[in-house]
């Protein structure tokens, strides 16, 4: 640590970032519950946690149908956030049934960009939990069409 305490501040910031990603991962894992709810609908094979700008965390699971009416876990979590009166996304994590992370699909990225047209580039997405790799939505969606 130098006389300005920069190393300490950086270490504290890193720990805080690790803590929030751990919390998001744990919340997603808690709702991850793959199951069949009918002959043609499976749910819970992917779970997502979205941290709103307020710090509140919203979760959702995927709903896979025999038609196009299903929904991804990330959009389900975002809709949960919006239902609860929030619209500013800070961080997103999506967990597959094996505990590994997934990147949001094109439809989920598109919704994030449309919900936060002026700030979508700042949204952070963890793409590898074990290696702690985080990318911004700008990195994942560099050429948004609007």
Task: Locate the predicted segments by residue.
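C-terminal binding/interaction regions
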Residues: 2-38, 86-146
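Hydrophobic "anchor" residues
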Residues: 56-57
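Compact, glycine-rich, soluble single-domain proteins
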Residues: 61-75
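Active-site- and interface-proximal helix/loop "cap" or "latch" segments in soluble metabolic
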Residues: 70-72, 80-88
């Amino acid at each position: 640590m130098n006389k300005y305490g920069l190393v300490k501040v950086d270490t504290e910031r890193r720990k805080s970032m690790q803590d929030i990603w751990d919390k998001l991962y744990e919340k997603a894992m808690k709702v991850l519950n793959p199951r069949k709810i009918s002959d043609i609908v499976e749910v819970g094979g992917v779970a997502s946690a979205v941290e709103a700008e307020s710090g509140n965390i919203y979760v959702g699971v995927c709903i896979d149908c025999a038609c196009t009416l299903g929904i991804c876990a990330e959009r389900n979590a975002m809709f949960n956030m919006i239902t609860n009166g929030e619209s500013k996304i800070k961080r997103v994590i999506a967990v597959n049934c094996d505990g590994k992370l997934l990147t949001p699909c094109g439809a989920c990225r598109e919704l994030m960009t449309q919900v936060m047209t002026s700030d979508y580039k700042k949204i952070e997405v963890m793409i590898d939990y074990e290696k702690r790799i985080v990318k911004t939505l700008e990195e994942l969606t560099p050429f948004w069409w609007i």
